[in-house]
Design a protein with these regions (language model features):
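Alpha-helix N-cap/helix-start positions at coil->helix boundaries
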Residues: 11-15, 42-43, 70-73, 99-100, ...
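Hydrophobic, well-structured mid-protein blocks that either form specific transmembrane helices
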Residues: 92-114
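Histidine/lysine/aspartate-rich catalytic loop segments that bind and position anionic ligands
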Residues: 103-108, 125, 131-141
Length: 209
């Protein structure tokens, strides 16, 4: 019973610290956000990252700490921050062992709009080979957002994945053109999943306007 009470108290204490750092940040004081970056509660550390990122106050040392944090909640917060901060390496996050981190990192990669070979290659690998369907879906969406022809083949292959990934892959074809794209859309128009068919119909109509 004692451990349960300790856990409850720890949770309450963590919530209070998060509230404190957020309130001070609203007043322009980031001191607690920096102090709590090494807090014992991962939710507090994650909140520190979010607050510092919103205030453009994540320096190289803090970024390094966040990327190597042992808890996925913290690395997830880093992935969200990466969407608006190109100093945060999405490549590191894309190779994370936790699928939730990878999913967010894929989204961040699409938001960063960096189109180097490594990003395209890693996203393509996730889109086709990751065990988690949400990661594959997020990677396909990122490749579509980047609109780089080097990612097109992976998007086309993803149109043969499970329904949720197929739908995302069809939408991701929007920036591209060519016979392969036309053929993929034509095939999607008769897909067994109605949402895939709808996505293909909408995109076909859009491209013909």
């Amino acid at each position: 019973m004692g451990s349960e009470e300790d856990s409850l108290e720890f949770t309450r204490s963590g919530i209070e610290r998060r509230q404190q750092l957020v309130q001070l940040a609203r007043e322009g004081d980031l001191s607690l956000a920096r102090e709590f970056f090494s807090d014992d509660d991962p939710r507090v550390r994650a909140s520190s990252i979010a607050v510092l990122s919103e205030n453009d106050a994540l320096d190289e040392s803090l970024i390094a700490l966040g990327l190597s944090d042992r808890h996925p909640l913290v690395r997830m917060s880093m992935a969200r921050a990466a969407a608006q901060n190109s100093s945060i390496s999405v490549l590191t996050l894309l190779s994370d062992e936790d699928p939730a981190v990878v999913e967010i990192a894929c989204w961040a990669a699409g938001e960063q709009t960096e189109r180097n070979d490594s990003i395209i290659e890693v996203l393509s690998g996730i889109a086709l080979e990751h065990d988690d369907a949400l990661c594959r879906e997020s990677a396909v969406a990122a490749l579509g957002a980047l609109g780089d022809v080097r990612g097109l083949e992976s998007i086309l292959e993803a149109t043969q994945d499970i329904a949720t990934v197929r739908r995302r892959a069809v939408i991701a074809l929007a920036p591209f053109e060519g016979q392969a794209v036309t053929d993929a859309l034509q095939l999607a128009l008769s897909d067994r999943d109605w949402q895939v068919r709808q996505a293909a119909e909408d995109l076909t109509k859009y491209l013909s306007e």
